[in-house]
Amino acid sequence: MQAAPSLRRASCLLLAAILDLARGYLTVNIEPLPPVVAGDAVTLKCNFKTDGRMREIVWYRVTDGGTIKQKIFTFDAMFSTNYSHMENYRKREDLVYQSTVRLPEVRISDNGPYECHVGIYDRATREKVVLASGNIFLNVMAPPTSIEVVAADSPAPFSRYQAQNFTLVCIVSGGKPAPMVYFKRDGEPIDAVPLTELPAASSGPVQDSRPFRSLLHRDVDDTKMQKSLSLLDTEYRAGRPYTERPARSLTQDPSLFVQPTTENIPETVVSREFPRWVHSAEPVYFLRHSRTPGSDGTVEVRALLTWTLNPQIDNEALFSCEVKHPALSMPMQAEVTLVAPKGPKIMMTPSRARVGDTVRILVHGFQNEVFPEPMFTWTRVGSRLLDGSAEFDGKELVLERVPAELNGSMYRCTAQNPLGSTDTHTRLIVFENPNIPRGTEDSRGSASGPAGVRLTLVLALTVILELT
């Protein structure tokens, strides 16, 4: 009686072995892949071992967290045929072997999990198929496609009396995964303090909790500092130039007063202005990163470098933003040089203005490359502008229907960015217009003589007739 249970167990094991032999064995595995770069060729290999007859091999792409499986390739052993299910891909994959799929030019959209399903016939009956599968994650990388360095809050004015914070923004787009972004100054890496949130531009100079550090030898030496101070003294001994936005006086500057004339008077460029405060310590830099995922799987990275600007030191300093990424063989780089504006070039049209013309005075360049973008302010020396305003902000000043009274008037263009300010003066020469008799135009350039009176009477009579 005791042998009966053991006999039954032996019979069950023997039956299971017989069933396994009838069904056959099948093992499937997919060779792992390192991350690949978009545009490269990729081969997905599905290795399997079996002693049965193959029925089919099916490749799936898994999406939506595994809830959707999209057939991308099928090998049908019954008919010895293979075909693609990837209509949108226009058969970008080729069957190299029965278990291998090749993507000649992989895309970022190909990133994700894949599964290989293999089916064999059951030895006991051809109506039954035994299945096994393996899976792999295809990690597709993409190098950044663009890099740009801009100044935050640009254009911004020049600060003459107090220090102000300045921020450079490096924008890197098109990378997957997110690249590493860092800054250099004059070719040397910047040791920046990581920051989660940047201070406001008006919150005053940014401070560092680390111990005090002396001046950077690469940025400031005695010669450069002495040159800056001597230039500052020289310019202010010669008189204070026009600044950021001082309290403006409508009294004409005697040094700029010139009697009206019809001669061509060139523009007068006033020397640049420097601030009256000087830093004596190395600037402290603060760095913050932000990441914005894109709809295509890439990431836009913005690196913001903030410090307290010192025009004496930072003017003509070279800042570079560099990017490291596993899909790049060498770092990407973008450079900017901080430069204060110097000598705006003024163009006036028409070159020979007559009474009643519309005159345009335009800044069309500088004597140097300027960064960041400057802001422009126009004023009339000793008086208000033609429209009655005290100043006009913009690159182009438009004077409509200029009257004869503007002949000889002087206009000042102030170009400024956080690194400095410069003034340019130009004189407007207005010639007589033979089509407009003398004395028939008021200060707004409109007709006020007999012809104008007759025109007014005609218009009034027309209105009366229409009303009746």
From Swiss-Prot:
Signal sequence coordinates: 1-24
Primary location: membrane
GO cellular component: external side of plasma membrane; inhibitory synapse; postsynaptic density membrane; presynaptic membrane
UniProt tissue specificity: Expressed in brain (at protein levels). Highly expressed in the pyramidal cell layer of the dorsal and ventral hippocampal CA1 and CA3 regions, layers 5 and 6 of the cortex, the thalamus and the pons and weakly expressed in the cerebellum. Expressed in neurons but not in glia.
Membrane disposition: Lipid-anchor; GPI-anchor
Keyword Transit peptide (UniProt): no
InterPro entries: Ig-like_dom, Ig-like_dom_sf, Ig-like_fold, Ig_sub, Ig_V-set, Nectin/Nectin-like
Record's subcellular location: Postsynaptic cell membrane
Domain Ig-like residue range list: 25-132, 344-429
Keywords: Cell membrane, Disulfide bond, Glycoprotein, GPI-anchor, Immunoglobulin domain, Lipoprotein, Membrane, Postsynaptic cell membrane, Repeat, Signal, Synapse
Gene ablation phenotype (knockout): Mutants grow normally. They show an impaired sensorimotor gating with no effect on motor activity and coordination.
Glycosylation sites: 82, 165, 407
Disulfide bonds: 46-116
GO biological process: synapse maturation; trans-synaptic signaling, modulating synaptic transmission
Binding partners and assembly: Interacts (Ig-like 1 domain) with NRXN2 (via Laminin G-like 1 domain) in a trans-interaction manner.
Domain notes: Ig-like 1 domain is indispensable for synaptogenic activity whereas Ig-like 2 domain is secondarily responsible for the activity.
Entry protein name: Immunoglobulin superfamily member 21
Species of provenance: Mus musculus (Mouse)
